Amino acid sequence: MSKNELLNVRIKNGTFYVSSKEDKGDGWVKQEFPNPQKKEETLVRYHKNVSIEGTVNHLAMNDDKYQGKVLNLIVGGEYQSYALSVPIMDTGGSVLTTNQYFNSLVGALENIKKGDKITMFVNSKNYDKKDRLYRNVVTLNSDGKLIKSNFSFSEVPKWKSSNTDNDFGETITKWDASPTNKFYIDKFKEVLASFKSENHKEESQDPEIKVKETPSIKSSSLQNSEPDLPF
């Protein structure tokens, strides 16, 4: 990989990875997916697992063609930078919820500032009672210590429920995660506002920062963010 290359990073079960339409050699593993737009067609991608370590450069909420609203975080490493996109909403289940990886990032981001050095990895060891990996991102500071949220799980609003009887006299419970969703989305908005405030302070203190940093991030993102299915 070339120096200062921007890697578009995604998350799958237990790891960060980058995706390519071409086999780039050592470490790249072939993956096959059904094309959601043409179900009779099989798409081929090559994945390579990566770790994220570097300096926090950029945080935003963006729109993705396939995933809707996403959290976008850019971390600058020594030889390459990492653009991590995480969908805010998880539409795969019967109840509309915020994405669990997103939730874990929001908690850590409360205590991360632009310029902080961090290390990030995806949980690959801890399982729930149903033997499923917990879907969370672990973030460490420059001293290797866990960056925790400012809130406890007991402070997160619970899902709402309502019961109705169907025509057979059976009681059906309908779940609504909107209180929980709003909590995490509001927290993310607060974090974004804090990052924007830091940017304004830097630019007012040193006008050169706007010229040196912002265009390089944006141009790199545009050059390396070819629209593709989220595989």
Task: Give residue ranges: language-model regions.
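Short acidic, low-complexity intrinsically disordered linear motifs used
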Residues: 212-231
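Low-complexity, intrinsically disordered short peptide segments enriched in small/polar/basic residues
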Residues: 6, 206-208, 214
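OB-fold ssDNA-binding interfaces and closely related basic DNA-contact patches used
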Residues: 1-85, 93, 97-110, 125-166, ...
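Intrinsically disordered, low-complexity mixed-charge segments
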Residues: 191-210
